[in-house]
Each structure stands twice: as structure tokens, then as C-alpha cells.
């Protein structure tokens, strides 16, 4: 039995009531690298693709980003590779891809970066991909950090490049700084490349901590190409799949089929395992123990020569007539369910607001109670027909995606 990754599952209810109609069953699955993987460290192949258009001069944005890039350089080992590309109307390669063996020289090059003009992010992305391809680095974690503070021309080219990055195993992590960037485009770029939605750098002073998180995330990767598959028996149908950690994201219908759910998890980090929430529709069953899914995780650990390893788990519930037992819910699972429902409804409100400047969706108290006071206040303004700023829109979206990073329970 493989010991590199633990496939952990919990169900919303271990005991389900006998019923004459289909019922929803929730499954929470986590793919967690074990202690056996604690010492694994793969080389990094980083491309930092950064906006230095005129607007980056405001509020010390460029100055803060330059300091964050220097911090990244200091955190790398000589076995890691880094390149830095600045873009405005065109792309400039400040540091061509090379091992991080001369941190002082690299930081001096960063210090010399000046403000440019215009914003053509696609040119920066293309140059960044070229640098990531410059060397063949065995077992490297290929990452692009893409930062902008505004809107770009040639947005479709950016999407095409994100798809190309995924084909080559390069994950793009988009970062938006300030309040004027196109969150829809940056979110798409992240997802199309096999990553997640854009991270919001609310103030320039936040750049340091967010860049540090990005570096640590890459350093913590120990498992590659993880794919989670759930096979369902007759009488069980998939309803929805949602990533809940590290952030909330609806995985859409593309991962669902009649009797199977297939979710590409990608890289697994040793200190930040991903988790998904599965909703199933289970047809009526007689009393007894029934399997509702078989979960299988396949993965590679190239640093120790493992490919296509698999770990499996059978997931079962008991149907019974005892109303007391069948009413008992798993608080951890249901907390995730509550946060996912809140995220879904808040996202609907934001989508309506972006399209029409108002919303007809009303949020019930059981939704708003999991939101912080800033988010509640902004949503209340929208519900009353008032306008909120673009920064507030981005704050709400960013915070709501991260609701599951803390679990809390009603008192």
C-alpha cells in the first residue's frame, strides 16, 4: 500500500434515514502527503512576470513589488532557477533564466527597474514562458507569478498562453495589485493554466507576505500530477464538486459524468493539502450498510522515482430507521457545506452587481453570519441599491473564496 499520500474522507452523515425519495450525501475528501514526504524538496523554476506600466508608480506599488522580488531571490537556493520579466507596452527581460547563485547581482538588477508605459500582458507572459523553457531542469516545479495593476490589450492572447502553459506543466499564479485590474481575466488565466483564481494584493505593503506565500507554496510541493477519481455504484449520481481548500472554487460540470467524478488536483504541498466537497444524490435504499463511492487518488513522486501510484478508499453509509441516529451530522463536513453555500450565493450577488449595478438576490442570516463585518456591510449596501467601489468588490470575492481557511461553529 502506498505510504506517500493519505486519502482522508468524512461523510456528512454516517447514518441516513430510510426514505422514499433520493437524498443528498456529502463527502469531504483530503489528499494529504504523509510525514514520509517531509524532507522532499524539488528544484524551483520561477518566472516573475511583472507589470511596470505608468500606473505602477502610484502608491509605491512598483517599489513594494521590487522589495518583494528581492525577498524571493533571498529565499531561493543555488539549485533553483529564476527569471524576471517586466512588461508595459513591451516585455523586458531583467534577469534571464539562471540558477540563483548571485543574489546580490540579481537584486541590483531589480533595483534598476524603472517605470514604463502601456500594458501588454501577453508579451510579458510569452517572454516568461520562453524563459521557463530555457533549461531542462529534472523534476523542477515550473511556476509563473504574474502581477498587474490594470487592464491589458490582447486579452484573448493571454488566455491562449495560459492554456499553452498548462500543456507544458507550468502553473500561473496571477496577482492583482490595487483596484483597477481585470479580475475576470486574471481568474481565467489562473484556472486555464491548472492553478487557482487570482490573489488580491489590497495594498502595496501586502506584496511582501503574498510573494512569500507563493515561494513557500512552490517549495512545499512534494507530489505531482495528483488526480482524484470517484466511481459511483448504480443508484448514486453526482450533483456537484467543489474545491474547498486551499480556497473555494466550483469545479463545474466538466469533472462530472454519469457514474464517475474525475478531479485533477495537480501538485500536492506537504503543509497545505487540498480538499474537495462532493455532493451526491442517493436513491432510496433498504436498511443496511451501502457503499456510495470508491475514491482513488493517483499521483507521482518524481524525486524518488514513483509514477502512477494509487491509494483507494471505500466510502459507505448506513441506512436505518432510527431517527435519532440519522439526524446526527458531522460538524466539520457541514461547516464546509455552509461556507460553500455562502460562497455560491455571494458570488451570485457579485455577478449580478457587476452586470447590472444591483442585485435581486437576498442573503439569509445563515449565510451572512459566516461573513466578516466588512463583507456584510458592503453586501448590505448592494442590497439597498447603493454602489460600492471596485476595491470592495475585489475584497468581497477574495475573502469569500477563503472562508474555508478557518472553521468555526455556532456557539
Where are these regions (language model features)?
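Exposed acidic/Ser/Thr-rich ligand/metal-binding surfaces
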Residues: 2, 8-225, 286-287, 369-374
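OB-fold and OB-like beta-barrel modules that bind single-stranded nucleic acids
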Residues: 28-30, 278-279, 295-297
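Solvent-exposed residues in well-ordered beta-strands and their adjoining turns
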Residues: 32-34, 231-233, 281-283, 300
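Short aromatic-acidic-glycine turn motif
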Residues: 95, 234-243, 302-306
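Extracellular adhesion/glycan-binding regions together with long Ser/Thr-
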Residues: 246-271
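Low-complexity, intrinsically disordered segments enriched in Ser/Thr together with acidic residues
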Residues: 269-288
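Long, acidic serine/threonine- and proline-rich intrinsically disordered regions
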Residues: 282-411
Amino acid at each position: 500500500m502506498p505510504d506517500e499520500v493519505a486519502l482522508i474522507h468524512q461523510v456528512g452523515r454516517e447514518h441516513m434515514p430510510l426514505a422514499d425519495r433520493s437524498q443528498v450525501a456529502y463527502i469531504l475528501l483530503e489528499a494529504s502527503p504523509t510525514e514520509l514526504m517531509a524532507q522532499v524538496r524539488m528544484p524551483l523554476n520561477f518566472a516573475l512576470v511583472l507589470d511596470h506600466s505608468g500606473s505602477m508608480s502610484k502608491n509605491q506599488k512598483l517599489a513594494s513589488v521590487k522589495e518583494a522580488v528581492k525577498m524571493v531571490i533571498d529565499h531561493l537556493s543555488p539549485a533553483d532557477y529564476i527569471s524576471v520579466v517586466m512588461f508595459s507596452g513591451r516585455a523586458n527581460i531583467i534577469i534571464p533564466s539562471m540558477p540563483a547563485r548571485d543574489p546580490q547581482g540579481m537584486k541590483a538588477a531589480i533595483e534598476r527597474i524603472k517605470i514604463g508605459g502601456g500594458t501588454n500582458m501577453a508579451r510579458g507572459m510569452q517572454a516568461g514562458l520562453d524563459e521557463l523553457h530555457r533549461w531542462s531542469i529534472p523534476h523542477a516545479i515550473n511556476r509563473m507569478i504574474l502581477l498587474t495593476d490594470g487592464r491589458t490589450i490582447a486579452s484573448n492572447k493571454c488566455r491562449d498562453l495560459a492554456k499553452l502553459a498548462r500543456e507544458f506543466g507550468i502553473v500561473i499564479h496571477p496577482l492583482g495589485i490595487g483596484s483597477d485590474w481585470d479580475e475576470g481575466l486574471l481568474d481565467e488565466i489562473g484556472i486555464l493554466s491548472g492553478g487557482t483564481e487570482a490573489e488580491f494584493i489590497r495594498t502595496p505593503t501586502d506584496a511582501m507576505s503574498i510573494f512569500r506565500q507563493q515561494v513557500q507554496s512552490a517549495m512545499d510541493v512534494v507530489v505531482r500530477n495528483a488526480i482524484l477519481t470517484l466511481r459511483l455504484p448504480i443508484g448514486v449520481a453526482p450533483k456537484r464538486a467543489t474545491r474547498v481548500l486551499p480556497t473555494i472554487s466550483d469545479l463545474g460540470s466538466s469533472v462530472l459524468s454519469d457514474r464517475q467524478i474525475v478531479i485533477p488536483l495537480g501538485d500536492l504541498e506537504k503543509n497545505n493539502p487540498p480538499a474537495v466537497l462532493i455532493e451526491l444524490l442517493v436513491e432510496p435504499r433498504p436498511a443496511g450498510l451501502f457503499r456510495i463511492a470508491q475514491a482513488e487518488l493517483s499521483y507521482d513522486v518524481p524525486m524518488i522515482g514513483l509514477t502512477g501510484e494509487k491509494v483507494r478508499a471505500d466510502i459507505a453509509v448506513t441506512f436505518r430507521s432510527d431517527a435519532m441516529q440519522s439526524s446526527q451530522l458531522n460538524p466539520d463536513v457541514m461547516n464546509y457545506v455552509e461556507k460553500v453555500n455562502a460562497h455560491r450565493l455571494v458570488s451570485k450577488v457579485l455577478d449580478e452587481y457587476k452586470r447590472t449595478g444591483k442585485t435581486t438576490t437576498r442573503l439569509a442570516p445563515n449565510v451572512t453570519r459566516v461573513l466578516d463585518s466588512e463583507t456584510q456591510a458592503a453586501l448590505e449596501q448592494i442590497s439597498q441599491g447603493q454602489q460600492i467601489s471596485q476595491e470592495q468588490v475585489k475584497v468581497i470575492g477574495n475573502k469569500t473564496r477563503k472562508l474555508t481557511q478557518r472553521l468555526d461553529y455556532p456557539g
